[in-house]
Amino acid sequence: MKNVLSIQSHVIYGHAGNSAAVFPMQRLGVNVWPLNTVQLSNHMQYGHWAGSAIDAAKMEQLVDGIAAIGALKRCDAVLSGFLGSPAQARAAVEIVRTVKATNPNAWYFCDPAMGQTGGIRPEPGVEEFIVAELPELADGMAPNHGELQKLAGQRIETVAEAVEACRSIIRRGPRLILVKHLHDRNSPADRFNMLVVTETEAWIGQRPLYAFPRHPVGVGDLTSAIFVARRLRGDSVRAAFEHTLAAVHAVVKATYDARRYELELVAAQDEIAQPSEWFGAWVTGAD
């Protein structure tokens, strides 16, 4: 069974960061080692919260502890999400390097949380660090539309421009870019677009967009987690993308139908594993 070290925020109540990522990856048959960068009572969109961030040095100490018992060599991938400070971002880089030195076959998937995540904003300097340092280290990245624009340093209004932006990042290091939410001026307003791009291929997929009174937090974290888990299980890029598109839709639909604010992960767990409704991806902008 594959193992992933997941470095993200955590909420006790609800689903954001590792609280949105761990269970879906486990349900897909992947062992998850959660390292929580922030521990909060709930995500901050509620307007009240309690909690704090973990010290960056302790992040490295925790991973050193795993190495000390000889288990780090079994880590197959690292997934990073919210990094609250430049010190945490630097610690994450050192952790990834340690994992890759211990297991040269391990890979790193970066969800570059640069904006508000569950109401949390990273400290000044985190965005600049992510843009400057992480593409060279990452094997894959999962930005949303705004994060893609920041990483590529360009405005994006069409799918063709998004593919071009992804390729510019790929030239810096990653093998693939998963765009978790793509705004395309040519797409219907009731569709949610996702895109995945490699050096030579690109696929786009659409799912229904639901009109929530308050949009649930953690959908992006869920998206990255499912994609990573399917890749660890051996899916091709396209197969992992299509499964992710379908499984995330199932969770979002279950949440909408139940009129809930928090993601219905447990209720939709069978759909995460085996979605009943699929949305095929089609080739776009391929060389």
Curated annotation (Swiss-Prot):
Residues that hold ATP according to the record: D111, A142, E147, K180
GO cellular component: cytosol
The protein's annotated pathway: Cofactor metabolism; pyridoxal 5'-phosphate salvage; pyridoxal 5'-phosphate from pyridoxal: step 1/1
Native source organism of the sequence: Burkholderia thailandensis (strain ATCC 700388 / DSM 13276 / CCUG 48851 / CIP 106301 / E264)
Cofactors (names): Mg(2+)
InterPro entries: PM/HMP-P_kinase-1, PyrdxlKinase, Pyridoxal_kinase_PdxY, Ribokinase-like
Quaternary context: Homodimer.
Role according to the record: Pyridoxal kinase involved in the salvage pathway of pyridoxal 5'-phosphate (PLP). Catalyzes the phosphorylation of pyridoxal to PLP.
GO molecular function: ATP binding; magnesium ion binding; pyridoxal kinase activity
E.C. no: 2.7.1.35
Binding locations of substrate: S9, M44, Q45, D221
UniProt entry keywords in alphabetical sequence: ATP-binding, Kinase, Magnesium, Nucleotide-binding, Transferase
Source domain of life: Bacteria
Catalytic activity: pyridoxal + ATP = pyridoxal 5'-phosphate + ADP + H(+)
Family stated for the protein in its record: Belongs to the pyridoxine kinase family. PdxY subfamily.
Protein name (record): Pyridoxal kinase PdxY
Any one of the GO BP annotations: pyridoxal 5'-phosphate salvage
